[in-house]
Amino acid sequence: MYNLTSRQEQVLQLIKQYTEETGYPPTRAEIARILGFKSANAAEEHIKALARKGAIEIMPGASRGIRLTESQSGIPIVGRVAAGNPILAQEHIEDYCNIPNSFFSPSADYFLRVHGMSMKDAGILDGDLLAVHRTDQVRNGQIVVARIGEEVTVKRFKRQGNQAQVELWPENPDFKVIHVDMRDQEFSIEGLSVGVIRRD
């Protein structure tokens, strides 16, 4: 949408998250400290670049003089995730939904547009927006966003003890259980389902 570099995207996501959690944007010094920049000047350069690209507006003379543009407010809606790419890569973000992330518990970091009917019996249908809390800490029986190799899927997580095998269960008898052996397959949990929105 804004053709951001990975570092600019990182700064933008920090500004959004910080603003959502505290009600006001971070200072340059806070951005530098959180992201490990050597100085506030480094943060300032990224902020200026974001403003040039239209992702934020700068209000001169204020230490917290950063405002997200209208299209940046709300929770990002992620469409199809290209193989191997981070879920919140800028090219995956279709839009933003103006619902406070605190509407969900735990809070939602993004919406993932659902493709397919493998989770229909859990009330998650094709085209729905799945509210996702970013975490890799999940419990048996929870609905998760998982990455297997380069593909992302939404399934119910099941694991016996500390075994290397994981099962990802669909909520539709027409689909098969996915068996993952973490000893020879790349596997990670990208987030936890915390709600679903259906748009007419």
From Swiss-Prot:
It catalyses: Hydrolysis of Ala-|-Gly bond in repressor LexA. The active site is at 118 (for autocatalytic cleavage activity), 155 (for autocatalytic cleavage activity). InterPro entries: LexA, LexA-like, LexA/Signal_pep-like_sf, LexA_DNA-bd_dom, LexA_repressor, Peptidase_S24_LexA, Peptidase_S24_S26A/B/C, WH-like_DNA-bd_sf. GO terms for biological process: DNA repair; DNA replication; negative regulation of DNA-templated transcription; proteolysis; SOS response. Its EC number is 3.4.21.88. Keywords: Autocatalytic cleavage, DNA damage, DNA repair, DNA replication, DNA-binding, Hydrolase, Repressor, SOS response, Transcription, Transcription regulation. GO terms for molecular function: DNA binding; serine-type endopeptidase activity. It is an enzyme of class 3 (hydrolase). The record marks 83-84 as: Cleavage. CDD domains: S24_LexA-like. Residues 28-48 bind DNA. The keyword Transcription applies. Homodimer. PANTHER family: LEXA REPRESSOR, LEXA REPRESSOR-RELATED. Belongs to the peptidase S24 family. Represses a number of genes involved in the response to DNA damage (SOS response), including recA and lexA. In the presence of single-stranded DNA, RecA interacts with LexA causing an autocatalytic cleavage which disrupts the DNA-binding part of LexA, leading to derepression of the SOS regulon and eventually DNA repair. NCBIfam families: lexA. This is LexA repressor. It comes from Cellvibrio japonicus (strain Ueda107).
